[in-house]
């Protein structure tokens, strides 16, 4: 099993063989949890491997409903972050805006990286990602002092 395209095609085949709306089952395919637990016995037709695409892994495990919910979460978080960055114009210093933009840029990099790696499976990465999201949103609430 070499190459991402073969892995992605295998994942999509498995999704459509199971339930496309609800998926194959959380933690049962394409990632670290599935590799460690091995709930399903491996044979010639099925073997465990890393999906190397977190969004596609989410689609296969949770179906179209789960992927749509996850994308809504990420888009909503991104919109809130952009709104907070826009509100940093009201801050006393430009440093707040630079910090907010820098944190959001890092988050965008992680979201793009998820197309090529299961980066969200790493607990530290998830903690850093959602902490950065919270920090960006918080920075949008700083205000200039009234005189």
Located regions from the model:
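Hydrophobic membrane-targeting alpha-helices
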Residues: 2, 14, 20, 77-84, ...
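Generic recognition of well-ordered alpha-helical segments
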Residues: 7-10, 54, 58, 77-80, ...
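Generic hydrophobic alpha-helical membrane-span motif
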Residues: 29-31, 58, 69-72, 123
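Extended hydrophobic-aromatic, low-complexity segments
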Residues: 21-25, 67-69, 121
